[in-house]
Amino acid sequence: MDTSQHHTRDDLDLLTRHWEPAGPAKATMLLVHGLSEHSGRWDHVARFFAAAGYDTHGFDLRGHGLSDGAHIDVDRFDVFVGDVAEMVVEVRSELPLVIYGHSMGGLITTLYAVSDHPQPDLYVLSAPALGADVAVPLRIAASVLGRAVPGLRMGTGLRGEQLSRDPKVGEAYFADPLVYIKGTARFGAALLGVMPEAAEAVGAIRVPTLVIHGGDDTVVPPWASEPLAAVPGVERRVWPGLRHEMHNEPERDEVLGFVAVWLDDHLREA
Protein backbone atom coordinates (compact mmCIF):
# COMPACT_ATOMS: atom_id res chain seq x y z
CA MET A 1 0.00 0.00 0.00
CA ASP A 2 1.36 3.40 -1.02
CA THR A 3 0.29 6.80 0.31
CA SER A 4 0.33 10.14 -1.43
CA GLN A 5 -1.58 13.41 -1.47
CA HIS A 6 -4.17 14.95 -3.74
CA HIS A 7 -4.23 18.75 -3.93
CA THR A 8 -7.80 20.02 -4.25
CA ARG A 9 -9.27 22.91 -6.18
CA ASP A 10 -9.46 24.93 -2.93
CA ASP A 11 -5.87 24.25 -1.82
CA LEU A 12 -6.34 21.36 0.58
CA ASP A 13 -4.19 18.24 0.64
CA LEU A 14 -6.12 14.98 0.91
CA LEU A 15 -4.29 11.83 2.03
CA THR A 16 -4.61 9.11 -0.63
CA ARG A 17 -3.92 5.38 -0.46
CA HIS A 18 -3.28 2.91 -3.28
CA TRP A 19 -3.43 -0.87 -3.09
CA GLU A 20 -2.08 -2.33 -6.33
CA PRO A 21 -2.97 -5.88 -7.39
CA ALA A 22 -0.14 -8.35 -7.85
CA GLY A 23 -1.18 -9.18 -11.40
CA PRO A 24 -3.07 -7.44 -14.21
CA ALA A 25 -6.02 -5.39 -12.95
CA LYS A 26 -9.55 -6.08 -14.16
CA ALA A 27 -10.95 -2.74 -12.92
CA THR A 28 -10.20 0.30 -10.78
CA MET A 29 -11.98 0.79 -7.44
CA LEU A 30 -12.35 4.03 -5.47
CA LEU A 31 -13.34 3.65 -1.80
CA VAL A 32 -15.25 6.44 -0.02
CA HIS A 33 -15.24 5.96 3.76
CA GLY A 34 -17.80 7.03 6.36
CA LEU A 35 -18.23 9.74 8.97
CA SER A 36 -15.47 10.23 11.56
CA GLU A 37 -13.24 7.44 10.21
CA HIS A 38 -10.51 7.38 7.56
CA SER A 39 -9.39 5.25 4.62
CA GLY A 40 -6.82 3.40 6.73
CA ARG A 41 -9.66 1.55 8.46
CA TRP A 42 -10.43 0.04 5.06
CA ASP A 43 -7.02 -1.56 4.59
CA HIS A 44 -8.33 -5.15 4.88
CA VAL A 45 -11.17 -4.42 2.45
CA ALA A 46 -8.81 -2.80 -0.04
CA ARG A 47 -6.40 -5.72 0.22
CA PHE A 48 -9.28 -8.13 -0.41
CA PHE A 49 -10.25 -6.38 -3.63
CA ALA A 50 -6.63 -5.87 -4.72
CA ALA A 51 -6.14 -9.63 -4.35
CA ALA A 52 -9.27 -10.08 -6.48
CA GLY A 53 -7.73 -7.99 -9.28
CA TYR A 54 -9.00 -4.49 -8.50
CA ASP A 55 -6.59 -1.56 -8.62
CA THR A 56 -7.90 -0.07 -5.39
CA HIS A 57 -7.69 3.54 -4.23
CA GLY A 58 -8.93 5.34 -1.14
CA PHE A 59 -8.63 8.78 0.35
CA ASP A 60 -9.34 10.54 3.62
CA LEU A 61 -12.27 12.89 3.20
CA ARG A 62 -11.53 16.53 3.98
CA GLY A 63 -11.63 17.09 7.73
CA HIS A 64 -11.03 13.38 8.34
CA GLY A 65 -7.98 11.26 9.08
CA LEU A 66 -4.76 12.76 7.72
CA SER A 67 -6.40 15.12 5.24
CA ASP A 68 -6.51 18.90 5.56
CA GLY A 69 -9.61 20.75 6.66
CA ALA A 70 -11.29 21.49 9.97
CA HIS A 71 -12.39 18.23 11.55
CA ILE A 72 -15.92 17.26 10.49
CA ASP A 73 -16.91 20.81 9.65
CA VAL A 74 -18.55 21.63 6.33
CA ASP A 75 -21.78 23.50 5.69
CA ARG A 76 -22.65 21.78 2.43
CA PHE A 77 -22.00 18.35 1.00
CA ASP A 78 -21.24 19.41 -2.55
CA VAL A 79 -17.64 19.97 -1.41
CA PHE A 80 -17.38 16.23 -0.70
CA VAL A 81 -18.95 15.45 -4.08
CA GLY A 82 -16.40 17.73 -5.71
CA ASP A 83 -13.59 15.87 -3.98
CA VAL A 84 -14.91 12.55 -5.29
CA ALA A 85 -15.06 14.06 -8.77
CA GLU A 86 -11.42 15.10 -8.50
CA MET A 87 -10.40 11.66 -7.27
CA VAL A 88 -12.26 10.04 -10.18
CA VAL A 89 -10.19 12.11 -12.59
CA GLU A 90 -7.01 11.14 -10.73
CA VAL A 91 -7.56 7.37 -10.60
CA ARG A 92 -9.48 6.77 -13.82
CA SER A 93 -7.75 4.78 -16.55
CA GLU A 94 -8.83 2.70 -19.51
CA LEU A 95 -10.12 0.11 -17.03
CA PRO A 96 -13.73 -0.01 -15.79
CA LEU A 97 -14.26 2.08 -12.66
CA VAL A 98 -16.14 1.07 -9.50
CA ILE A 99 -16.99 3.55 -6.72
CA TYR A 100 -17.65 1.89 -3.35
CA GLY A 101 -19.10 4.18 -0.68
CA HIS A 102 -19.98 3.31 2.91
CA SER A 103 -22.40 5.09 5.29
CA MET A 104 -21.79 8.83 4.89
CA GLY A 105 -19.46 7.84 2.08
CA GLY A 106 -22.44 6.03 0.56
CA LEU A 107 -24.48 9.22 0.89
CA ILE A 108 -21.72 11.20 -0.82
CA THR A 109 -21.45 8.53 -3.51
CA THR A 110 -25.23 8.67 -4.06
CA LEU A 111 -25.04 12.44 -4.45
CA TYR A 112 -22.25 11.91 -6.98
CA ALA A 113 -24.34 9.29 -8.80
CA VAL A 114 -27.21 11.74 -9.36
CA SER A 115 -24.90 14.60 -10.36
CA ASP A 116 -23.69 15.71 -13.77
CA HIS A 117 -20.14 14.53 -13.07
CA PRO A 118 -18.65 11.78 -15.28
CA GLN A 119 -19.99 8.46 -14.06
CA PRO A 120 -18.20 5.19 -13.23
CA ASP A 121 -19.18 1.81 -14.62
CA LEU A 122 -20.53 0.38 -11.34
CA TYR A 123 -21.45 1.50 -7.83
CA VAL A 124 -21.45 -0.31 -4.49
CA LEU A 125 -23.35 1.44 -1.69
CA SER A 126 -22.80 -0.02 1.77
CA ALA A 127 -25.36 1.15 4.36
CA PRO A 128 -25.77 4.46 2.49
CA ALA A 129 -26.83 7.19 4.92
CA LEU A 130 -29.97 8.37 3.14
CA GLY A 131 -31.86 8.60 6.43
CA ALA A 132 -31.49 8.32 10.19
CA ASP A 133 -33.70 7.69 13.20
CA VAL A 134 -33.59 11.25 14.55
CA ALA A 135 -36.63 12.62 16.37
CA VAL A 136 -38.23 15.77 14.95
CA PRO A 137 -37.28 17.94 17.96
CA LEU A 138 -33.64 16.93 17.53
CA ARG A 139 -33.77 17.73 13.81
CA ILE A 140 -35.15 21.16 14.63
CA ALA A 141 -32.50 21.65 17.30
CA ALA A 142 -29.76 20.70 14.84
CA SER A 143 -31.04 23.22 12.32
CA VAL A 144 -31.28 25.98 14.94
CA LEU A 145 -27.84 25.25 16.40
CA GLY A 146 -26.36 25.07 12.92
CA ARG A 147 -27.39 28.68 12.41
CA ALA A 148 -26.98 30.06 15.93
CA VAL A 149 -23.71 28.41 17.01
CA PRO A 150 -22.38 26.72 13.85
CA GLY A 151 -18.97 25.99 15.35
CA LEU A 152 -20.31 24.20 18.43
CA ARG A 153 -18.84 20.69 18.58
CA MET A 154 -20.94 17.71 19.56
CA GLY A 155 -20.24 13.99 19.77
CA THR A 156 -21.78 11.59 17.29
CA GLY A 157 -23.22 9.43 20.06
CA LEU A 158 -21.97 6.29 18.35
CA ARG A 159 -21.40 3.19 20.48
CA GLY A 160 -18.82 0.58 19.57
CA GLU A 161 -21.32 -2.28 19.59
CA GLN A 162 -23.29 -0.55 16.84
CA LEU A 163 -20.45 -1.10 14.38
CA SER A 164 -20.01 -4.86 14.67
CA ARG A 165 -20.79 -7.85 16.86
CA ASP A 166 -17.02 -8.24 17.22
CA PRO A 167 -16.16 -6.10 20.29
CA LYS A 168 -12.59 -5.60 19.07
CA VAL A 169 -13.91 -3.47 16.20
CA GLY A 170 -15.46 -0.89 18.51
CA GLU A 171 -12.45 -0.94 20.82
CA ALA A 172 -10.07 -0.26 17.92
CA TYR A 173 -12.36 2.47 16.56
CA PHE A 174 -12.34 4.52 19.76
CA ALA A 175 -8.62 3.89 20.34
CA ASP A 176 -7.73 5.20 16.86
CA PRO A 177 -6.32 8.75 17.10
CA LEU A 178 -7.39 9.43 13.51
CA VAL A 179 -11.06 8.78 14.28
CA TYR A 180 -12.68 12.12 15.15
CA ILE A 181 -15.88 11.66 17.12
CA LYS A 182 -16.99 15.29 17.37
CA GLY A 183 -18.40 17.39 14.55
CA THR A 184 -19.78 20.91 14.40
CA ALA A 185 -23.44 21.87 14.60
CA ARG A 186 -23.03 23.32 11.11
CA PHE A 187 -21.94 19.90 9.85
CA GLY A 188 -24.79 18.09 11.61
CA ALA A 189 -27.36 20.42 10.10
CA ALA A 190 -25.88 19.93 6.63
CA LEU A 191 -25.86 16.14 7.03
CA LEU A 192 -29.46 15.88 8.21
CA GLY A 193 -30.56 18.32 5.53
CA VAL A 194 -28.97 16.50 2.60
CA MET A 195 -30.14 12.99 3.53
CA PRO A 196 -33.76 13.42 2.33
CA GLU A 197 -32.57 15.32 -0.74
CA ALA A 198 -30.43 12.36 -1.75
CA ALA A 199 -33.21 9.86 -1.02
CA GLU A 200 -35.62 11.78 -3.24
CA ALA A 201 -33.10 11.97 -6.09
CA VAL A 202 -32.12 8.30 -6.39
CA GLY A 203 -34.33 7.81 -9.44
CA ALA A 204 -31.68 9.68 -11.41
CA ILE A 205 -29.13 6.88 -10.93
CA ARG A 206 -28.30 5.39 -14.34
CA VAL A 207 -25.38 3.11 -13.45
CA PRO A 208 -25.73 -0.52 -12.25
CA THR A 209 -25.57 -0.37 -8.46
CA LEU A 210 -25.32 -2.89 -5.63
CA VAL A 211 -26.74 -1.81 -2.26
CA ILE A 212 -25.76 -3.84 0.82
CA HIS A 213 -27.13 -3.31 4.32
CA GLY A 214 -27.03 -5.01 7.71
CA GLY A 215 -30.44 -5.98 9.01
CA ASP A 216 -29.49 -4.96 12.57
CA ASP A 217 -27.87 -1.66 11.60
CA THR A 218 -28.86 0.98 14.17
CA VAL A 219 -26.52 3.68 12.81
CA VAL A 220 -28.11 3.82 9.36
CA PRO A 221 -31.32 1.78 9.68
CA PRO A 222 -32.16 -0.53 6.77
CA TRP A 223 -35.20 1.53 5.81
CA ALA A 224 -32.82 4.32 4.76
CA SER A 225 -31.67 2.37 1.69
CA GLU A 226 -35.14 1.11 0.70
CA PRO A 227 -35.76 3.93 -1.85
CA LEU A 228 -32.84 2.58 -3.88
CA ALA A 229 -34.49 -0.83 -4.29
CA ALA A 230 -37.11 0.62 -6.63
CA VAL A 231 -34.56 2.12 -9.04
CA PRO A 232 -34.00 0.17 -12.29
CA GLY A 233 -30.54 -1.36 -12.37
CA VAL A 234 -30.17 -1.35 -8.59
CA GLU A 235 -29.90 -4.60 -6.61
CA ARG A 236 -30.33 -4.45 -2.83
CA ARG A 237 -29.22 -7.16 -0.41
CA VAL A 238 -29.88 -7.11 3.36
CA TRP A 239 -27.98 -9.44 5.71
CA PRO A 240 -30.15 -10.32 8.74
CA GLY A 241 -28.35 -9.93 12.05
CA LEU A 242 -25.43 -7.87 10.74
CA ARG A 243 -24.68 -4.40 12.03
CA HIS A 244 -23.40 -1.18 10.48
CA GLU A 245 -19.92 -2.20 9.33
CA MET A 246 -20.64 -5.46 7.54
CA HIS A 247 -17.04 -5.49 6.30
CA ASN A 248 -16.01 -5.74 9.97
CA GLU A 249 -18.52 -8.39 11.03
CA PRO A 250 -17.56 -12.06 11.56
CA GLU A 251 -19.27 -12.71 8.19
CA ARG A 252 -17.05 -10.17 6.40
CA ASP A 253 -15.67 -12.75 3.96
CA GLU A 254 -19.19 -13.75 2.92
CA VAL A 255 -20.22 -10.12 2.41
CA LEU A 256 -17.10 -9.08 0.49
CA GLY A 257 -17.23 -12.29 -1.53
CA PHE A 258 -20.81 -11.51 -2.54
CA VAL A 259 -19.76 -8.02 -3.63
CA ALA A 260 -16.82 -9.40 -5.63
CA VAL A 261 -19.03 -11.91 -7.47
CA TRP A 262 -21.60 -9.20 -8.24
CA LEU A 263 -18.89 -6.91 -9.60
CA ASP A 264 -17.28 -9.66 -11.67
CA ASP A 265 -20.65 -10.65 -13.16
CA HIS A 266 -21.46 -7.07 -14.13
CA LEU A 267 -17.99 -6.42 -15.51
CA ARG A 268 -18.44 -9.41 -17.81
CA GLU A 269 -21.77 -7.98 -18.98
CA ALA A 270 -20.28 -4.54 -19.69
Q: What are these regions, as identified by a protein language model?
A:
Residues 235-270:
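Catalytic active-site module of serine/aspartate enzymes centered on a nucleophile-bearing elbow/loop
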Residues 1-23:
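N-terminal cap/lid segment of alpha/beta-hydrolase-fold proteins
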Residues 205, 211-213, 217:
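Short beta-strand/loop motif that positions the catalytic acidic residue
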Residues 218-224:
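Conserved alpha/beta-hydrolase "acid-adjacent" motif
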